[in-house]
Amino acid sequence: MLKQIRPAIVMIVFFTVLTGLVYPLGMTGIAQALFPRQANGSLIEKDGKVIGSELIGQAFASDKYFHGRPSAAGNGYDAGASGGSNLGPTNPKLIERIKGGAEKLKAENPNQPVPMDLVTTSGSGLDPQISPEAAYFQVPRVAKARGIDEAKVKALVDGQVEGRELGFMGEPVVNVLALNLALDAAK
């Protein structure tokens, strides 16, 4: 019987070592060698201190900053609680949350339609980007809070718009953290 079980045990140990150690360590080594910034989380540093990642959204509450999408991930962009709200399109809680968010934003900028991504969460709840329309919608509030010309703020948004991936996939987006850092740098 041991003769029959031995090949199975050898294969289990072999593939456990291959897929559990060799492959992950090999891929980590290749990623660190070829793409070190991305392999380490695409972290953004300011004055030698990590302030965020290009890949994870952050909550910005001040009117002096652009705000990202609402987060369904725990208590405000908690990466450990990543996930959608799982509320269906007819769920009263979802409808009420969207209406409340839209009313608040409409009061802030009554002459513009509220972009959907400013009132709806993403699948992960952690998206770092918003649409250019959502960024332009916030320009008057940010310019007023900072006491600077709207045209200057709009130009900063224009400079932060990232086009479609490979020229045809997805939609143009604006990374909120990068935009807010550019805003701070422009003063």
From Swiss-Prot:
It is a single-pass membrane protein. GO terms for molecular function: ATP binding; P-type potassium transmembrane transporter activity. Pfam families: KdpC (PF02669). One of its GO terms (cellular component) is plasma membrane. It comes from the Bacteria. Keywords: ATP-binding, Cell inner membrane, Cell membrane, Ion transport, Membrane, Nucleotide-binding, Potassium, Potassium transport, Transmembrane, Transmembrane helix, Transport. Its main location: membrane. It is found in: Cell inner membrane. The chain crosses the membrane at residues 7-27. The system is composed of three essential subunits: KdpA, KdpB and KdpC. Belongs to the KdpC family. Part of the high-affinity ATP-driven potassium transport (or Kdp) system, which catalyzes the hydrolysis of ATP coupled with the electrogenic transport of potassium into the cytoplasm. This subunit acts as a catalytic chaperone that increases the ATP-binding affinity of the ATP-hydrolyzing subunit KdpB by the formation of a transient KdpB/KdpC/ATP ternary complex. PANTHER family: POTASSIUM-TRANSPORTING ATPASE C CHAIN, POTASSIUM-TRANSPORTING ATPASE KDPC SUBUNIT. This is Potassium-transporting ATPase KdpC subunit. It comes from Mesorhizobium japonicum (strain LMG 29417 / CECT 9101 / MAFF 303099) (Mesorhizobium loti (strain MAFF 303099)).
